């Protein structure tokens, strides 16, 4: 299996993504998704569209700092490409261990210590299809944001406009600004 760090294409991000109270409560959770495709996806094209996608989500290619925020430093997201040429799509669908066998690797402890990105991707090319797996830190995105990210990736890959993610954290109160009664 070959793993490459994918970084934001174009302008380099900066700043930090601060964890809200709710984000902190979700730091021990991982959101996982897996998609099956007929036909073999082009790994190079998927990486290229993913790099463009990260421009909309720069915090996902950063690293946690002091457990309070993600530094948007463009360290990159691990993107693994694997081959399973003897496995057919119809076999993969029936495998009880498919999520483990084809799932992206995500080290939750490494993420919380700033050694892993908040997101990881694995693309496994089968004999007649492809399995795409994403694992992400729930503290950096909720379910809606996770699935919107995947939808936006598909849109970018097909050359369509994306659904602009909401990233204005000023709307959320930070723990330091809350009074004891709140």
What are these model-derived regions, one by one?
Residues 1-182:
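Non-catalytic N-terminal regions of enzymes
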């Amino acid at each position: 299996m070959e793993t490459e760090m994918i970084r934001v294409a174009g302008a380099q991000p900066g700043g930090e993504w601060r964890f809200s109270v709710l984000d902190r409560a979700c730091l021990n959770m991982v959101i996982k998704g897996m998609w099956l495709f007929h036909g073999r996806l082009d790994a190079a094209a998927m990486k290229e569209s993913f790099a463009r996608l990260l421009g909309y989500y720069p915090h996902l290619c950063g690293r946690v700092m002091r457990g309070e925020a993600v530094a948007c430093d463009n360290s990159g997201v691990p993107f693994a490409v694997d081959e399973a040429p003897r496995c057919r799509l119809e076999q993969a669908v029936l495998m009880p261990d498919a999520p483990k066998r084809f799932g992206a690797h995500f080290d939750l402890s490494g993420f919380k210590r700033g050694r892993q990105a908040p997101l990881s991707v694995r693309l496994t090319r089968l004999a007649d299809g492809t399995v795409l797996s994403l694992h992400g830190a729930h503290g950096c995105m909720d379910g809606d944001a996770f699935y919107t990210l995947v939808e936006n990736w598909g849109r970018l890959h097909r050359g369509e406009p994306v659904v602009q993610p909401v990233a204005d954290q000023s709307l959320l109160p930070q723990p330091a600004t809350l009074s004891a009664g709140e």
